């Protein structure tokens, strides 16, 4: 069994855009820390970044399932390890 990849150009573009937004969120957190913003505000931004990263992860898992549905054991293993 080979590992599935993101072959669809639109899927790649969507994932790249998603990751760029996450990158921006993380930069915002770093800036907030430098600017001595409240812990509550920083935690809120971290929570948003974490949720966005989780969505990106589950999109990758979805890609695996769509491209190789018979690889359910591997998907289950990855979810147990990283999910």
Describe every region a protein language model picked out.
Residues 1-83:
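Solvent-exposed interaction patches of small proteins and small membrane subunits
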